[in-house]
Amino acid sequence: MNEYVDKIKKLMEKEMVRYVIAGGMTTAVNLVSFFVLRLVTDLSRSAANIIAIMLAILFAYFANGFYVFRSEQRKSVGRIIREFISFVGMRLFAMVVEVVGTNLLCDSFRYNEFISKIIIQVVVLVINYIFSKCFVFKKDKKPVKDILADNYIMIIAFIIPAIFMFVLWVVAEIGPFGGHSLTMVDSLHQYLPFFSDYHDKLVNEGSLFYTWDIGMGSNLLDIIAYYMACPLNFIIVLFSREHLYIAMCVLISIKIALSGMTMASYLGYKCRNKNNLLIIPFAVAYALSNYVIGYSWNLMWMDCILILPLIMQGFEQMMEDGSNYRLYTLSLFYGLLCNYYICFMICVFLVLQFILTNHKNIYKGAEDTLRFAGTSVMAAAMSAFLLIPAYIGINTTASATRHFPKWEWYGSIWDMIKQMFVLTEPIKSQQFDGGVNLYCGTFAILLIGIYIFNTKIKWYEKLKNVILIVFLMMSFNNTLLNYIWHGFHDQYGIPNRFSFLFIFILLSMGYEAIANTDKKQIPGIALGIIVAFGLLVYADKNIDMDRTVIILTWVLFAVYSAGILVLVLVRGKGRFAVAAILSVLCLTEIVFSAAKGYESNGTVNIPDYYGDAASVQAAIDSVKTGHFPYRTELNNTKVVDESTYYNMQGVSLFGSTVSNDLVNAMHGLGFYTGANEFLFDGANPVSSSVLGIRYLFRRQDEHMSYDMDYVDTVDGVDVYQNSRALKLGFMVNNELKDWTSDASNMFDSINNFVEKSTGVAGTFSQIYPEVTGSSNDITITHDNPYSEYFGLSDITPGIVSFGLSFDITEEQNDLYIIANCNGITKIRIYVNGEEQNYERLQYQTYHVGHLIKGTNVEVEYYFSAGVPDNTSARLTIATLNGAAFDQAYEGWADNQLNINKFEDGYVKGHISVDEAGLMFTSIPYDSGWTAYVDGRKTDIQTVAGAFIALDLEKGDHVIEFKYFPRGLKSGLIFTFAGWLVFALLMNAKTIKEKRGSKKGKPEDEDRTDDEAAIE
């Protein structure tokens, strides 16, 4: 008996056994608490989960601290408090994993609650063990004050940008200080609405795979992968929807500050001295460069900006010591996870770095190649659960069609060098693709020559970096190279998105130059200074630059040159003082320029766009009862994706993941479309019926052009109803499979859709009234009365306009027009001299109104500057044939899909089919959908590759649609394999290191400090 007791005691001495016992008891506390709360209270799954986890955390701390990871030494109160704070912090991270993971399995994978909870408990158990063992109860853990002392430079490099951003918040009245925001351009029109939908899914336990709130129905995983994959984004659950813009500004500010810290870490490693005071200005310059000031509203890009220094630090560690690849793998994984688009540019940069790295000999080169390729593939595999679905999705977009541009230059290279100088305004958006953000401090320019002439820096390192900055500068100015850097994609108004790589190299070179200065380098320093001043003289003569910039650069060059020379000559405490003064001067320039940059960028006043959000939401709620299988829209949006912001099941979508086939189909139905967008603008009775748009909300100061019935006014917002909104699916003729959206005339395309689906012809009839042109700026010609095109010539330079007017000649007309022209900005429409509308109308259908004979209609076209001469404008005029539309609607409405269950990524309903044919649905086609008819899986058909359709036989049928993101299964397999390989490699490395340390361990190593002192 005693033998068994001794065995049990020995077994209990093993830490892993104790952890399994304590972990099992903690899991029991968690599970029992969770299911009791779910059974006896009305708490939501997430709320019950959080309470259960908090109870488990309290139990687990004492179990782990005093039973599992027990120490022979008596713990001080301070250590207990520190351990408790660390433990709770780590467990809170695990709580996020558990809550999100449970909801993901329940709502996205549709697993049972109990099964989901058990699966996640296993994952959390592993995470908690690693954190407790390696961080919380680590026996040789450093005191906090020692950690702070060892890393004070990195901390300062974080604090300075953080303080700058806080002051910016106060001065620019951002967030709680005045309602302004850093979310501008696409961040306002795309990201904020997408974050709203993401927020809704996280808070209300929705699917993270699919959403009906974006573009009629979209793959949410694709959108998360492109815009919102950063783990830090989970903080949005702490904010209400109306304060999400504040959460986004917080994220931007945190990432900017972290960029300073990571750059400081890299520079400290680069020159093997992490406590050099001069690191600070270079790190802050990276965090507050013009690239960051201009483009930080792309908050998902900032993850890659902040992780780049760690990727490069890990890369260089790996090249020096082949076994040291953990930092590289994990940091590259983080970059790929957070934003694969910008990380693609980093990967191209890494390949160039690797090619230009000195591998010493062919054997080392082969070994480095295998290691670099292997760890890079491993990092990609670890993030494959997002990368593979995202790659499949991006290949359905317009950008998947690659048209390589010619080898051409945007302009003079000196125009780009000009962007490196102080007081250069950062670019936040620009149509010219040759624009670039390069400024990161005048001292960075000065140090280029000093770096080149520094004899302490290895020649091949200098050659590598010079080649890289020259190649990058070429790429900024070259159409083909630019296209490749941007992922074989056009830039669309945000030029040279990879210029942060140039800034990174420039600052790295600059710091390496100044960190390796001594008296022997004075000749090289002098030559470098001469080169810098020579560049400035040339720039003054050959570049159109403001005199203030030239003078200020002269002054800064002189001051920095003097400071560097004094730094070289002085030793001891004097050198530290000079370094401190020089750092302060550099920081002053950077902070001043950043302040001017943000002043130039401006901010967005959120109340201008969402000031009436409560009223709009009240109107939406007046007709919305939970999830419903019909669509709603806003009459005139203030931001492009505004319907998504309100979590409406709308039509519009402006985003980088939009399907090209869907864009083309929406164009064919009369909507406004762009390269990566389709909007509700252009809706007409046919498209509104087919897509099931039942309600429209109109702010009372807006013009209403859509033909719908007024229902009510709720808090100043008018509610309109489309009585002919069809259900999600309905029967049509098989001929609709042959419909294409490529007709040159939208009215013809719509007529074709109606005729193929119902057999009814002539829904829209094009008319040709006598049109009169008028303009003081343009000569207008119209030779053929049956042509919808009007010649434009003799165009006056500058902003111009012209008008086309006509009279109604029939008794009754339900009039629609299409008005467009290259270079157009807005169109103004008058009916009998009274302005009806003035907005951005492009190639889309527009409802002028129900007009009677003799009514005059005038359409004015307004252009931006630079309209090409000898171009043409288009005015297509048509009337809606009410009888034909009524007949078509009756044909569609006869056999509709009645919905029984409607969730994100899941639809179930029944339909009675009078005659075998095609069931058209307004569900956007995605290969992730699977269809079932009467319980049997069936092939999905498509209409124009854009909408899902099913072949159905006569009779009653139960229809079911299930969604699972394409590529996710294989992605999860690769991710599991990648992490497994990484864990095995790390474990093997740890075992090897322990064995090595034991072999070299002296016999008396186990003695205490007191014993050693006695001897």
Regions found by a protein language model. Give the residues of each.
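Membrane-interface coil-to-helix junctions
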Residues: A162-M263, V284-I305, I394-A398, W407-F432, ...
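Membrane-interface micro-motifs in multi-pass membrane enzymes
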Residues: L221-A225, I246-L258, L278, A285-P309, ...
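Contiguous transmembrane helix-bundle modules in multi-pass membrane proteins
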Residues: I342, L463-M474, T479-L480, H489-S615, ...
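Extracytoplasmic/lumenal acceptor-recognition loop(s) of multi-pass membrane glycoenzymes
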Residues: L585-I606, D621-V690, L726-K727, M731-S757, ...
